[in-house]
Amino acid sequence: MVTLSLTPELLAKLQSRQPLLWVNPRLGQPLPASAPSLELIAAAEARLARCAPLMAALFPELASSHGQVESQLMPATGLQYALGEGAEGAWFIKRDDQLPTAGSIKARGGFHEVLAIAESIAIEHGMLDPDGDRRVLATEAARKLFSQYSVTVGSTGNLGLSIGVMAAALGFDAVVHMSADAKAWKKDRLRKRGVRVVEHEGDYAQAVAAGREQALGATRCHFVDDERSALLFFGYAAAARHLARQLAEAGRVVDAAHPLFVYLPCGVGGAPGGITYGLKALLGDHVHCFFAEPVASPCVLVQLASGSDDPVSVYDIGLDNRTDADGLAVGQASHLVSPLMASQLAGVFTVPDDQLYVQLLALKTSMGVEVEPSAAAGIGGPGWLRDSPEGRAYVRDHGLDMRDATHVIWATGGSLVPREELHRFQAYATALAHVPGAMHKAA
């Protein structure tokens, strides 16, 4: 068993699945020399903008947004008061659960990578001028070209939906390797879109490894590597500028006297890591990003707290990576993201499965918003800062005035979840509410 430099107290809490807030002691240190250029964020923004007409042509549900894949920033005063947080600061929900077509945060990175692949192939074959109209990628000639290529990914569910739907829409042979904890409805939805789904008995890492292995032995096959992909990462990072605009439109200033806190559910780390990277590049020390991970799967926490440059997994400390938050059921953090988050991430808090349902129910009853369990992981973030010794110390050490703070809780998925599944989530959460002590807050 690997313990590395985890303190005995932290290790004991992790192994006993005790909810906790870990504050990153390396926040604010320089990025590693190998860090990707921030110019790649602008490149991703530009790609998504020039492909917007193509997206509107491919997906009728994007017509009203002119092909922009973006989500609402929703005031969350109802949730704030339902959880007894008082009036300190302003709360918002970032509604990536409503992102069109893919229904989750994974649309940001997944769509961006598939669009980049399609552009590259079309330019290489003389079908697309570098400055040309991207709607040519939706023509029959383009579909015939793309059908000669496959796009493969390994996923617990939501990234597979994103990649599979986008690749199939363009005519690629789309293959999604899915882990044992992937939900049946996600597999069914992909198959209905013409995507080949390969099921595996192992966990997320094994599904990714299987996809990578298939791609190595194939010609004209692009493997979307959730653990290492820069194209995914910068697709997520491109969300930062739009969020900044939304905050400005809501009258929320972000500066030294008006700090911004962002709470992001975390699986392998690509989506929350990319968004954090983009926000820190844009807003610097004025934004404080925290990841939320299941108590059974705190892979980024374990990796960063270990202080090791070598991969460390939750299995190394005796955890089993079994959680109802299927999108967050990842045992080992991204090899690309972890070194970057070592200096950018404020901290990580962990959430038991029952608490996910408690928070899911609070969101439903206070605001009428229905999400899947993993998407509710970030809701406890403000409470950790207010109520825990670690959170209060973070606020004090950074000289933050919480009265004028803005809190953004990122809801990562849920709009595509079948109605019967949503009812099951709510029923279980309601039953929990009648169990003594079940409604306590994680902090």
UniProtKB/Swiss-Prot annotation:
Q: Which residues get modified to N6-(pyridoxal phosphate)lysine?
A: 106
The EC number(s) this enzyme carries: 4.3.1.18
What transmembrane ranges does the database entry give? none
Instruction: Tell me what reaction this enzyme catalyses.
Output: D-serine = pyruvate + NH4(+)
Enzyme's top EC category? lyase
Which SUPFAM superfamilies does its entry note? Tryptophan synthase beta subunit-like PLP-dependent enzymes (SSF53686)
What Gene3D superfamilies does UniProt report for this protein, alphabetically? 3.40.50.1100
A molecular function (GO) held by this record is: hydro-lyase activity
User: What's one Pfam family here?
Assistant: PALP
Family assignment from sequence similarity: Belongs to the serine/threonine dehydratase family. DsdA subfamily.
**Protein name, per record:** Probable D-serine dehydratase
Q: Which organism is it from?
A: Cupriavidus pinatubonensis (strain JMP 134 / LMG 1197) (Cupriavidus necator (strain JMP 134))
Top-level taxonomy: Bacteria, Pseudomonadati, Pseudomonadota, Betaproteobacteria, Burkholderiales
Identify the coding gene. dsdA
